[in-house]
């Protein structure tokens, strides 16, 4: 019900918001409650992208040039689209060949910087990223995907697929195929806040949830 404000390292913006007069019960003091669907949010990610409704992260994270879906759960230490040096393209992998102005060597090489902007990461909805996971540039994480703690994801992850390891490999699926298909048809992440409140306890059992709300 609450989108949680956080303060993170490079790639995130601090939410310096006052605490409301009446907090929801059991909300930890270190988190600032912000209503979902709050409209004029500041960007969550370096590059101007915004987090989807109800998406949250904890602790220190670096998220760059990424489009985050709704209801994403991002643990501490996650890095999405980290810097990739041109180690195989250039005679030197160091910044000085493209961030030239930092070293008094002339103008920056905007072509390489533009390439990084284009190599975006896209996450679907209800995606869970475990502690210290890394998602490399150009990767798409499907709806419901789960990335294990410490994984390094270098390829796309299918909807509701579970991956882990270095590099990340297929571990399993959250649900059997028929439930995955039903979840994609239901698209509960598009429900209104009032609908979520009314149907909250239906989420307790995935199979029963699909039987009740699958439009087919």
Regions found by a protein language model. Give the residues of each.
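Short, charge-rich, low-complexity interaction segments located
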Residues: 166-175, 180
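C-terminal amphipathic helix plus adjacent low-complexity
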Residues: 204-216
